[in-house]
Regions:
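Gram-negative bacterial Sec-dependent N-terminal signal peptides
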Residues: 1-15
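Compositionally biased amphipathic helical and low-complexity segments enriched in hydrophobic
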Residues: 5-8, 57, 119, 168, ...
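Beta-strand-rich solenoid/repeat architectures in extracellular/passenger domains
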Residues: 14, 27-42, 54-68, 80-95, ...
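Glycine-rich beta-solenoid repeat tracts in large extracellular/virion proteins
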Residues: 16-24, 44-50, 70-77, 97-104, ...
């Protein structure tokens, strides 16, 4: 095992620290205020190979300017990357990814007040793209993107958010929260989550295949745009079953022509609401709650 320790480093806004590329079986540990700046298409700021472990202290900052770049990526199985509080990741470029698990059984974890900002089309804020993997955020996480704030595409994988998360997308056909795995996966939010989506045919919470998205109390979902959905459970193939649950005090808004607050299209799937739920829509041909799949239901 090789260990690189860079502790109590003096912070400098003028001199960037080195990118981190942890080789197979290595352990890399850096202290607070570690700052990585990269320019160029296909760049990756922090990467972990098979069985590697990377730990960064508080207030780490990552900036990547270029198409198809990665801020943080697990590219080897059984790898782990962990941040302290106050991490910041900024991506500029098309098809960029802020944070992604790309290898099975890999995990990325953030402390409190992490923020990911992406500028460019076809981008992803946090992406769990491998099986048996996870990305976890502490309280007060913020993700701002054009195309997709968080997606889970690997089976038996999870994205987990602490209290008061704020996720926002601003592009047409954008998905703020996207669960696309075939089986066994989930996205969970603690109290006070805020989901915003502003764009034509955008979706606040999209369950494409199977799995569950769950919110605790006081969740807010707001979408604005023609043909937008606050929540959409799609009937993607025969036999997929999906579920969305809310705690008490949820507020769901959809504004625009033919907009839907909640639409459950998948068969035998469920939308479950706690007490004091408010669903409000505006716009011609807009709908508050609709169920299109055989056996689908709402629990109020």
């Amino acid at each position: 095992v090789v260990t690189l320790a860079v502790l109590s480093m003096p912070f400098s806004a003028n001199a960037a620290d080195a990118p981190i590329n942890a080789g197979a079986g290595t352990t890399v540990t850096v202290g607070d205020n570690y700052e990585i700046e990269m320019t160029g298409n296909g760049s990756t700021a922090v990467a972990a190979a098979q069985n590697a472990n990377v730990t960064l202290g508080n207030d780490a900052k990552i900036t990547v300017d270029g198409d198809s770049g990665y801020g943080v990526q697990t590219n080897g199985e059984n790898s782990k990357i962990e941040f302290g509080d106050g991490a910041g990741i900024e991506m500029t470029g098309n098809a960029a990814v802020g944070v992604e698990t790309s290898a099975d059984n890999s995990h990325i974890k953030f402390g409190e007040s992490a923020e990911i900002v992406l500028q460019g089309d076809y981008n992803y804020g946090a992406s769990v793209w491998s099986e048996n993997s996870s990305i976890e955020f502490g309280a007060d996480a913020k993700i701002t993107a054009v195309s997709n704030a968080v997606r889970v595409g690997g089976n038996d994988s999870q994205a987990i958010f602490g209290a008061d998360a704020i996720l926002t997308t601003s592009g047409d056909n954008a998905y703020t929260v996207h669960l696309g795995a075939a089986s066994g996966s989930s996205i969970t939010f603690d109290n006070g989550a805020v989901i915003n989506s502003d764009g034509h045919a955008s979706i606040g919470v999209f369950i494409e295949r199977s799995g569950e998205v769950s919110f605790k109390d006081q969740a807010e979902i707001k979408v604005t745009g023609d043909f937008a959905y606050g929540v959409y459970l799609q009937n993607q193939y025969d036999g997929n079953v999906s579920k969305i649950t809310f705690g008490d005090g949820a507020q769901i808004e959809a504004h625009g022509y033919n907009a839907d607050g909640i639409h459950v299209e998948a068969e035998n799937s469920t939308a479950e609401f706690g007490d004091d739920t408010v669903i409000s829509v505006s716009g011609e041909d807009s709908t508050g709650v609709s169920f299109g799949g055989a056996g689908s239901k709402g629990v109020f």
